[in-house]
């Protein structure tokens, strides 16, 4: 029997992909929503899609303990996809899971770098630390978990090539942080969702980090630019920003540019997606666990922009 799954933050950016994957995989799927979300015009398309997929809405709020406990008691698994501002509030979910006493597994809001293995500067450093603190709280309470480290969303990073404010890949020049040699990992949101849902009832992912690092999506920035150049039949001007200059730029920038740049520093300069080995004691890799999943490669993903 497929586990019943409750989503908290299910109408958000990555949440909506995972909710859809859950429903399509045959899991009884529940989304915690506020009354106001159901009538919010900005969310109407997402809500409509969820209804068509047979998703159940449970009225409640992250800040209403009783509603959280009540919702959690109806399911087996809780997946949090809350946004940046609510990361720190996941203690509320942990407390409710603890009180409900029936949860087989909790997936906190992660879906990025492995926050226990990062070399970051502010403001990324604090964001990563918040997620790491949530991990420690889950472990301290003895709640069964899976942490999904899905690295970069293709829909953001391959669309923009990490150029702040860009809405399409570059056509003439491209700014590269550091020397462009460390490898990063780019995954399509639908694939992240598919792998996450496959992990829900898999004993191999219990109390582990699920890394989504498919070989064809692990590529250096220099190679990414070369791949793109081949596709558009044009050589781009490459502007390299040395680490020292980048650190200065981060300090001088304001939100959200400083966030984008500091995450870029962690990934593209320090190599935080790929500078460690996945040990069986703490992690497993999704494309190895689920070779049947036909994931979208970076090469395939870029074709749509040519």
UniProtKB/Swiss-Prot annotation:
Single annotated GO MF: oxidoreductase activity, acting on NAD(P)H, oxygen as acceptor
Protein name as annotated: Phenylcoumaran benzylic ether reductase POP1
Claim: RNA-binding is one of the keywords in the record: no
One Pfam assignment: NmrA
Similarity comment: family membership: Belongs to the NmrA-type oxidoreductase family. Isoflavone reductase subfamily.
Active site: residue positions: 131 (proton acceptor)
GO BP, one annotated term: lignan biosynthetic process
Protein residues bound to NADP(+): 9-15, 34, 43, 135
Function, as annotated: Oxidoreductase involved in lignan biosynthesis. Catalyzes the NADPH-dependent reduction of phenylcoumaran benzylic ethers. Converts dehydrodiconiferyl alcohol (DDC) to isodihydrodehydrodiconiferyl alcohol (IDDDC), and dihydrodehydrodiconiferyl alcohol (DDDC) to tetrahydrodehydrodiconiferyl alcohol (TDDC).
UniProt keyword terms in alphabetical order: NADP, Oxidoreductase
InterPro entries linked: NAD(P)-bd_dom_sf (IPR036291), NmrA-like (IPR008030), NmrA-type/Isoflavone_red_sf (IPR050608), PCBER-like (IPR045312)
E.C. designation(s): 1.23.1.-
Known catalytic reactions: (-)-dehydrodiconiferyl alcohol + NADPH + H(+) = (S)-isodihydrodehydrodiconiferyl alcohol + NADP(+); (+)-dehydrodiconiferyl alcohol + NADPH + H(+) = (R)-isodihydrodehydrodiconiferyl alcohol + NADP(+); (2R,3S)-dihydrodehydrodiconiferyl alcohol + NADPH + H(+) = (S)-tetrahydrodehydrodiconiferyl alcohol + NADP(+); (2S,3R)-dihydrodehydrodiconiferyl alcohol + NADPH + H(+) = (R)-tetrahydrodehydrodiconiferyl alcohol + NADP(+)
Top-level EC class as recorded in UniProt: oxidoreductase
């Amino acid at each position: 029997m497929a586990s019943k799954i409750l989503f908290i933050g299910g109408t958000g950016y990555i949440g909506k992909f995972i909710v859809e994957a859950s429903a399509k995989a045959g899991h009884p799927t529940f989304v915690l929503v506020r009354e106001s979300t159901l009538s919010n015009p900005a969310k109407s398309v997402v809500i409509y899609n969820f209804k068509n997929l047979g998703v159940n809405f449970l009225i409640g709020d992250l800040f209403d303990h009783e509603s959280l406990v009540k919702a959690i008691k109806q399911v087996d698994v809780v997946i949090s996809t809350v946004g940046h501002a609510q990361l720190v509030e996941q203690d509320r979910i942990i407390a409710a899971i603890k009180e409900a006493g029936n949860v087989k597994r909790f997936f906190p809001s992660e879906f990025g770098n492995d926050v226990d293995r990062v070399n970051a500067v502010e403001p990324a450093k604090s964001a990563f630390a918040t997620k790491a603190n949530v991990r420690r709280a889950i472990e301290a309470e003895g709640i069964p978990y899976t942490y999904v480290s899905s690295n970069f969303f293709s829909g953001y990073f391959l669309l923009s090539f990490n150029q702040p404010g860009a809405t399409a890949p570059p056509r003439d020049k491209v700014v590269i942080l550091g020397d462009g040699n460390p490898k990063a990992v780019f995954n399509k949101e639908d694939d992240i969702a598919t792998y996450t849902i496959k992990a829900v009832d898999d004993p191999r992912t219990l109390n582990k980090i699920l890394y989504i690092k498919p070989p064809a999506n692990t590529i250096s920035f220099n190679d990414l630019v070369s791949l793109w150049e081949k596709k558009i039949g044009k050589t781009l001007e490459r502007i390299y920003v040395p680490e020292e200059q980048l650190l200065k730029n981060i300090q001088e920038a304001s939100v959200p540019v400083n966030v984008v740049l500091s995450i870029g520093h962690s990934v593209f300069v320090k190599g935080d997606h790929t500078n460690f080995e996945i040990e069986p004691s703490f992690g497993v890799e999704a494309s190895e666990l689920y070779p049947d999943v036909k994931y979208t490669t970076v090469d395939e993903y870029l074709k749509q922009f040519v």
